[in-house]
Amino acid sequence: MLYIEQSEMMLVPLITVTVVAGTILVCYILYICRKKIRTVYNDNKIIMTKLKKIKSPNSSKSSKSTDSESDWEDHCSAMEQNNDVDNISRNEILNDDSFAGSLIWDNESNIMAPSTEHIYDSVAGSTLLINNDRNEQTIYQNTTVVINDTETVEILNEDTKQIPSYSSNPFVNYNKTSICSKSNPFIAELNNKFSDNNPFRRAHSDDYLNKQQDHEYDDIESSVVSLV
């Protein structure tokens, strides 16, 4: 019994010594490794901060993506509504008896209004419209010019209405009422006084000359210039 008690008394200091020695050893080891531990801790801290920074933009991107998706859906729905409104308005315009809806095609492949006015005339106001059936030419500028087929065209060969112009042309007699100049052989002799000195006049027979003497004041030309 005494031996057991003595052995127990010896174990208590040994246990205490080992515990104290162990703690001292651990503290020494930690003291030696403090730099490494500190570097590891700092590295871990940096890694955690980086991870937090990475997570925050991802979360913002996810929120932005959800917002953009919702915005896109709203945009699509708005576009569909606008298309529906446009279709309804177009149908109403086509069904309405408006100017554009009542346009027709004429025989000349031109767009004509119901009032037989050309579509370009209604827009520009100055385009020329020719109506072949009525033989008239209308300009839509508050001016109407009528051309008739039966309109008499005045003869330019009349003596009293000849306008002297381009006097440098030797082949035309602009003053037919006066006596033909003998110095200009290119002018046709309109009177009966034929000159024998003019080699460019056409030779006439005696019958023709007699007829010309009978009709001295006729307006028909008596000769035509011809070059030999």
UniProtKB/Swiss-Prot annotation:
Q: Which residues lie on this side of the membrane: Cytoplasmic?
A: 31-228
- Which keywords, in A-to-Z order, does the entry hold? Host cell membrane, Host membrane, Host-virus interaction, Membrane, Phosphoprotein, Transmembrane, Transmembrane helix
Q: Does the keyword DNA-binding apply?
A: no
Which residues point to the Extracellular side?
Answer: 1-9
Segments spanning the bilayer are 10-30
Q: What is the annotated localization of this protein?
A: Host cell membrane
Which stretch carries the motif NPF-motif?
169-171, 184-186, 198-200
How is this protein situated with respect to the membrane?
Answer: Single-pass membrane protein
A Gene Ontology cellular-component term: membrane
UniProt-listed InterPro entries: Orthopox_A36R
The record's annotation in Pfam families points to: Orthopox_A36R
Modification note: Phosphorylated on Tyr-120 and Tyr-140. Phosphorylations activate the host ARP2-ARP3 complex and lead to actin nucleation.
Where are residues bearing Phosphotyrosine located in the sequence?
Y120, Y140
Family listed: Belongs to the orthopoxvirus OPG164 protein family.
Q: How does it assemble?
A: Interacts with host NCK. Interacts with protein OPG161 (via C-terminus). Interacts with protein OPG056. Interacts (via C-terminus) with host kinesin light chain/KLC1. Interacts with host intersectin-1/ITSN1 and EPS15.
Please explain the role this protein plays, according to its UniProt record.
Involved in the intracellular transport and egress of virions to the host cell surface with help of protein OPG056. Also participates in the formation of actin tails at the plasma membrane to allow efficient actin-based motility and thus cell to cell transmission of viral particles. Recruits host intersectin-1/ITSN1 and activates host CDC42 to drive ARP2/3-mediated actin polymerization.
How is this protein named in the record?
Answer: Protein OPG164
Q: Give the gene symbol.
A: OPG164
